[in-house]
A protein has these predicted regions:
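Short, strongly hydrophobic alpha-helical membrane anchors
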Residues: 1-14
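Juxtamembrane "helix exit" motif at the C-terminal ends of alpha-helical transmembrane segments
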Residues: 2-4, 90-116, 201-209, 215-220
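Hydrophobic alpha-helical transmembrane segments
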Residues: 11-21, 115-131, 205-210
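Hydrophobic alpha-helical membrane-embedded segments
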Residues: 16-46, 83-97, 128-151, 193
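Solvent-exposed, non-transmembrane helices and loops of integral membrane proteins
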Residues: 58-69, 154-183
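Transmembrane alpha-helical segments and their cytosolic interface motifs
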Residues: 71-97, 183-209
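Juxtamembrane membrane-interface segments at transmembrane alpha-helix termini
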Residues: 164, 220-229
Length: 229
């Protein structure tokens, strides 16, 4: 039975599977190149510079130089972005689930410009699942960022005399939490960016490939400190 099903599946979704594999390899190759450059020069990455900036900022605020109000306002502004994005991701998840329930009705119309890809409703559901998982990862990344930043909001105003004897309350450990929150925000942003080629995949594998190439080029520019954002 499996031998009868497998060739049919390959004929139906072979192009989509091969293009998806090529896109995954392209993304992995980019991150391998980026990792190699960062090992050689950490300041090549905007993320390294951002982490270093957050660590210096936390140590400055916790040094007791009267920056309590500024620290709270800065962290509040930091938290507002992931709060907004959590709501956005929730709406995207609901919208994606709505699409999955209408696969039989809209798959054919969305495949009007599909060049070489599958028109099967089953493959369409697989595409929707990839998109749904992407939005779920972004959602939990932003939720984690909010959680970590809320902890930092309390920890950063602890008096210096109360920090003695508690290594977990030291500026270094508080900075680690804020840096991790920043990494979660960056993860959420990158995940949403990768939703672009996944959305293009709904129209066909060719558009997935084009979208992935565009996103990798965009991320390569975004991650550089010299031209990063």
């Amino acid at each position: 039975m499996a031998n009868e099903v497998l060739p049919g599946w390959l004929r139906e979704a072979g192009a989509d599977a091969m293009v998806m594999a090529a896109c995954i390899l392209l993304v992995l190759a980019y991150y391998a190149f980026h990792r190699k450059r960062v090992r050689r020069d950490p300041t090549y990455s905007i993320h390294y510079v951002n982490d270093m900036t957050r660590r210096i900022w936390v140590e400055s605020v916790m040094s007791g130089t009267g920056k309590d109000i500024m620290a709270v306002q800065t962290l509040r502004n930091f938290i507002m972005y992931p709060i907004l994005m959590v709501s956005t991701c929730a709406l995207l998840i609901v919208g994606t689930l709505t699409l999955s329930g209408q696969a039989g009705n809209i798959a054919n119309s969305w495949h009007a410009i599909n060049l070489g890809g599958s028109h099967s409703a089953g493959v369409w559901i697989v595409k929707i699942m990839f998109l749904l998982v992407d939005f779920l990862v972004a959602f939990f990344a932003y939720v984690s960022a909010i959680r970590l930043a809320n902890h930092v909001l309390f920890m950063i105003n602890i008096p210096r005399e109360a920090q003695s004897g508690h290594d977990v309350l030291s500026p270094s450990h508080v900075a680690d939490r804020l840096i991790l929150a920043g990494k979660m925000v960056a993860l959420g942003m990158r995940t949403l960016i990768f939703a672009i080629p996944l959305a293009f995949w709904l129209f066909g594998p060719l558009y997935l490939l084009i979208g992935t190439v565009g996103v990798v080029d965009f991320l390569s520019r975004l991650a550089r400190h010299q031209r990063g954002l």
